[in-house]
Amino acid sequence: MENWNKYIPEGMKDILFKESNIKLNIEDQLRKIYKYSGFSEIISPTIEFYDVFNSNIQAIPQEKMYKLFDNLGRILVLRPDMTTPIGRITGTKMKDCTYPLKLCYTANIFRVNEKLNGKRGEITQSGIEIIGTNGIKSDVDSIVTAINALLSVGLKNFKIELGEAGFFQALTENMEIKEENLKKLKEIIRNKNYVALKKFLDEISSKYSKEDFELIKNLPKLFGDIKIIEKAKALTKNKKALKSLDDIHNIYKSIENIGLEAYISIDLGMVQNIDYYTGVIFKGYVEEVGDSILSGGRYDNLIQHFGIELPATGFAINVDDIMIALKKQNTMSMDKDKKVLIFYKEEFLRKAYDFMQELKMKKIICELSLLDDDKEILLYSKKKGIDFIIGFMGEEKLFVKDLKSDKIAFLKKDEIENLLML
């Protein structure tokens, strides 16, 4: 049997040093945005019962879930998303809370992906859920928070595309079409394949109205700015479809009033395989990443599976894809705190330790040297990105070497602190 002890499974990744630091900074920045927007963070178990995710509206197919068994033979899964566990927590532990609930999270989720497709099996998601209100104010709050979250990490040139789940449902609810053909139709529209769509509709056009036929035929073309809404309205008299278009229009206008409309576009061809979303849906895109970096929308039917009927909306950001985009845009933010290495003679350990603690309290990254040789200390410091080397060697003033300028000085402790705070 082959020994795999030096490898990791497909889709997994070790994240080291600089990359890890950048990722944690992104996560911290997103948490700040949520916190100062009134959201409370929650943490759910990595392992859940399979039954939590086994419903007819589950957004993640069961074949995409990592499954295992407990000692009683019950099926468990590594959580494939965070929204469903939050629905479980809300339905079972938050019935007496004050609504609307504003919850946030940053956690790893796990999905089985085909080999060699380049997708991760472990993904860091960061997002919010607004639970207990079904007005467009909460939809706007969710979308605006998403925009501010992406801006906060330094992302440039992104777009949030708005759609409406009820729009496509309204156009197709009276169609006599098999489930497999409906899935095929959705896929064609999502891929904006005009030729395949015309061929597909020509084969079944006699089964629904000419008006609906024309609108569905044009769905792949109905994307762009707010003018698309009026264009779509001119193609239908379907009351439910018109209501969906009005909802998108009103949400857009609210975002426009805030001044963030530059980040918004409309895509009426945004459809889903499973009837998970019930209202506005949105996805975030950036040129540097092929897939969406953010997805969200209204899902009013999920939490009722856990014992309480509550409307909800929210979004999830793919932190790993954000890192890819920031790297390509050359806008990754590194930790800018100064780094100090203190070396010392053994009899001055206590003084060196106390000074290190003082610097840490001032948010300066500081460590005591584990090396004694001068050359080794210098080499270590350069490779580690240390800014200053400080030496406790018995003199009244301390040895200080600035590794950026290569200058050496002998300074008192308060002078060193002033230097490091510049």
From Swiss-Prot:
The keyword Membrane does not apply. Transmembrane segments: none annotated. CDD domains: HisRS-like_core. Its main location: cytoplasm. Pathway: Amino-acid biosynthesis; L-histidine biosynthesis; L-histidine from 5-phospho-alpha-D-ribose 1-diphosphate: step 1/9. It is found in: Cytoplasm. It comes from the Bacteria. GO terms for biological process: histidyl-tRNA aminoacylation; L-histidine biosynthetic process. PANTHER family: ATP PHOSPHORIBOSYLTRANSFERASE REGULATORY SUBUNIT (PTHR43707:SF6), HISTIDYL-TRNA SYNTHETASE (PTHR43707). Required for the first step of histidine biosynthesis. May allow the feedback regulation of ATP phosphoribosyltransferase activity by histidine. Heteromultimer composed of HisG and HisZ subunits. This is ATP phosphoribosyltransferase regulatory subunit. The lineage of its organism: Bacteria, Bacillati, Bacillota, Clostridia, Eubacteriales.
